[in-house]
Amino acid sequence: MSAAELAIEAHGLTRRFGNVVAVDDIALSIPRGRIYGFLGPNGSGKSTTIRMLCGLIKPSSGTIRVLGLEMPRQVEALRRRVGYMTQRFSLWEDLSARENLAFMASIYTLEARHAAQRIAAAIAEYRLQEFLDRPAGTLSGGQKQRLALAAATLHEPQLLLLDEPTSAVDPQSRRDFWESLFALTAGGTTILVSTHYMDEAERCHGLAILDLGRIVASGTPTQLMQDLPLQVVEIEAADPTAVRAALRGLASLRSLAQLGLRLHALLAPPAAQAGSPTGALPGGQGEGDGVEQVRALLARAGIVATVRKAPPSLEDVFVGATLSAGATPH
């Protein structure tokens, strides 16, 4: 992909705060007109990376180009072309929704007639009429979110940076918010959004999973699920606690989660176990298909259960990518 087709390009991007490495040698190539997601736990480097990309903080090392501009050297030229929305509501709570939009239009130095047109369009697009003259501080989480998105897009930015924008809203508001994002990309806007919600990550055209400041997996959500290097096995039994205790003896087990009466297990595949005793069942069972391993182990323990392969989910990808080597299954 050529540089002209990329909205964001970064190489060797690193940020240190004293002895702490918050972002560690990240590389990014994000195409224009797409929604790209950062998925990761708190402290994984998502927010720090976004702040470097928009010029709010300088990298310790590495190179960044955003919309063809070199960061942070050309940050002033970038400001009018980028919208930024933080997790915390950052508009003025003592001003009404209408006054906030007018104030943001002045910050973006929009000409008066154009500002009036853009404000009217934002009011209609994001359904702000019902609370237009109420102080922003009195609005619900979903209403604040709609107002913040309207303000962030008032100047029609080419790139929209969203740092966990849906963390304080209800599921319906989140769903509506994402419909608005797809409408923006249909108009040519590129969007980079950080999240810790799996369903939101699945909506992205492309995705990077971050952990401890590094990108540990990247690709489309479908590709990441298809390429998961772990076997997914589901076990259903009357006594999940007994199953959990029995599976503790399976050295190939990488993760175990309970869903009602079902247990959802991630196992290292036979190829990853070759030449290593980690895939062997207690008592010398040896390697093999994950389903057969689990069935044999439960049979030896006298546990009646239904065991089957399951398709991987994005949560499985996330767990597999962020699970450190030798971590205790959970």
Language-model features: locations:
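Conserved ABC transporter NBD signature motif
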Residues: 62-73, 77-78
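Conserved ABC ATPase signature
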Residues: 94, 135-139
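Conserved ABC ATPase "signature" region
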Residues: 102, 106, 113-131
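Conserved catalytic motifs of ABC-family nucleotide-binding domains
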Residues: 156
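Catalytic Walker B motif of ABC-type/P-loop ATPase nucleotide-binding domains
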Residues: 160-163
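Short, charged/small-residue-rich alpha-helical element at the C-terminal edge
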Residues: 229-324, 330
